[in-house]
Amino acid sequence: MVKQTISAFILEKMYRNRVIGGRHISLEDLRTGCPSHERGNIERTLKKLVKENLIVQHPTSYGMQYALNPQRIDEIMKILNIR
C-alpha cells in the first residue's frame, strides 16, 4: 500500500463503521483487514492523521482510542470521494 492508500484505508474503515466523535476504536482493531507487512505503517499514518486533526485521540484506562473528528467530517468525505 502507498501512504495515501493507507490514509484512505484508515479513514474509510472508520467512516464505514461510524467511528465518529464519541465512538472510538483501538489501534489493534484498526489494523485488522490490513496485510501483515503493512501493519507498522498503520501506526505511523494514524499519527500523521492525528496531527492533521482528521482523527482525534481518546485516552482510556485500557489504552489510546481513536475516532474521526466530527468537525472535519465534510473534509474527510471529500478525501474519500463520498457525495
Model-predicted regions and their roles:
Residues 16, 20, 33-36, 55:
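General structural signal for alpha-helix termini and helix-helix connectors
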Residues 50-60:
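A short, conserved structural fragment
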Residues 34, 68-70:
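Short beta-strand-to-loop capping motifs
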Residues 62-68:
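Minor-groove-contacting beta-hairpin "wing" of winged helix-turn-helix DNA-binding domains
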Residues 1-20, 80-83:
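Short alpha-helical segments that sit at the start of domains
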Residues 71-83:
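Short, amphipathic alpha-helical interaction segments positioned at domain boundaries
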